[in-house]
């Protein structure tokens, strides 16, 4: 286990995780099935929520695929008997790839789906907290962005309380970046110009 997860092996694993995270499933599917560039649709964001504005079925498939990016990487690490903190670090790298894909000059999605994949794979309690919080907030306000923001904050607090420092620090860092990516949504909500999903 120590040999496999040594620094010599960790660097290429993190690099591969970044590349997997950077696969733009939303852009690919919308381009293939609808001949449209998702960057010119709605918010211009390359993510499941913006894909929803093209087709609901496509957005659901995008969501599953983006979640699966993190799940795949972490399941492989689990088979390699990696420490939980390494799983969080690698999941963090997948999320970074999703948010900052090299293929689109580091302008990607907002990281919610791969973050869900991380907690689904590592801590099922955080996953359920995230999903339930998102659903409740969305039913009340109908803003996907607000639901995501509150879910990230609540799951981040729970992770900080229940996980050890080495594990929680990576999830907290990941959460901060995801929240920063939602800053424009926060401004639009304050100004009353944020669009409800439906």
UniProtKB/Swiss-Prot annotation:
In what way does this protein cross or attach to the membrane? Multi-pass membrane protein
Q: Which GO terms describe its biological process?
A: phospholipid biosynthetic process
Q: EC class of this enzyme?
A: transferase
Pfam families in UniProt: G3P_acyltransf
Name the UniProt key words of this record, in alphabetical order: Cell inner membrane, Cell membrane, Lipid biosynthesis, Lipid metabolism, Membrane, Phospholipid biosynthesis, Phospholipid metabolism, Transferase, Transmembrane, Transmembrane helix
Instruction: Tell me what reaction this enzyme catalyses.
Output: an acyl phosphate + sn-glycerol 3-phosphate = a 1-acyl-sn-glycero-3-phosphate + phosphate
Q: Which residues cross the membrane?
A: 10-30, 57-77, 86-106, 118-138, 160-180
User: Do you know which SMART domains this protein is assigned to?
Assistant: G3P_acyltransf
Which InterPro entries does the record associate with it? Answer: G3P_acylTferase_PlsY
Which pathway, per its entry? Lipid metabolism; phospholipid metabolism
The EC number(s) this enzyme carries = 2.3.1.275
Cellular component per GO, a single term: plasma membrane
Main location (coarse class): membrane
User: Does the record bear Lipid biosynthesis in its keywords?
Assistant: yes
Which superkingdom does the taxonomy of this entry point to? Bacteria
Q: Tell me, what is one Gene Ontology molecular-function annotation carried by this entry?
A: acyl-phosphate glycerol-3-phosphate acyltransferase activity
Subcellular location per the Swiss-Prot or TrEMBL entry: Cell inner membrane
The task this protein performs is described as:
Catalyzes the transfer of an acyl group from acyl-phosphate (acyl-PO(4)) to glycerol-3-phosphate (G3P) to form lysophosphatidic acid (LPA). This enzyme utilizes acyl-phosphate as fatty acyl donor, but not acyl-CoA or acyl-ACP.
Subunit annotation: Probably interacts with PlsX.
User: Which family would the database say this protein is a member of?
Assistant: Belongs to the PlsY family.
Protein name from the UniProt record? Glycerol-3-phosphate acyltransferase
Q: Which organism is it from?
A: Anaplasma marginale (strain St. Maries)
Q: What is the lineage of its organism?
A: Bacteria, Pseudomonadati, Pseudomonadota, Alphaproteobacteria, Rickettsiales
């Amino acid at each position: 286990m120590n040999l496999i997860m040594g620094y010599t092996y960790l660097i290429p694993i993190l690099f591969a995780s970044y590349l997997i995270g950077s696969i733009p499933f939303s852009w690919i599917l919308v381009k293939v099935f609808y001949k449209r560039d998702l960057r010119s649709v709605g918010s211009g964001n390359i993510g499941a929520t913006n894909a929803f504005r093209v087709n609901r079925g496509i957005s659901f498939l995008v969501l599953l695929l983006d979640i699966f990016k993190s799940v795949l990487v972490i399941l492989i690490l689990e088979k390699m008997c990696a420490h939980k903190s390494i799983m969080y670090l690698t999941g963090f790298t997948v999320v970074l790839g999703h948010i900052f894909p090299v293929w689109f000059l580091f302008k990607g999605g907002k990281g919610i789906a791969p973050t869900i994949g991380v907690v689904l794979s590592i801590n099922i309690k955080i996953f359920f907290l995230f999903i339930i919080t998102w659903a409740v907030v969305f039913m009340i306000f109908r803003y996907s962005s607000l639901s995501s923001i509150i879910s990230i904050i609540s799951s981040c607090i729970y992770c900080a309380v229940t996980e050890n420092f080495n594990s929680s620090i990576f999830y907290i860092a990941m959460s901060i970046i995801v929240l920063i990516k939602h800053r424009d949504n926060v401004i639009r909500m304050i100004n009353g110009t944020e669009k409800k999903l439906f």
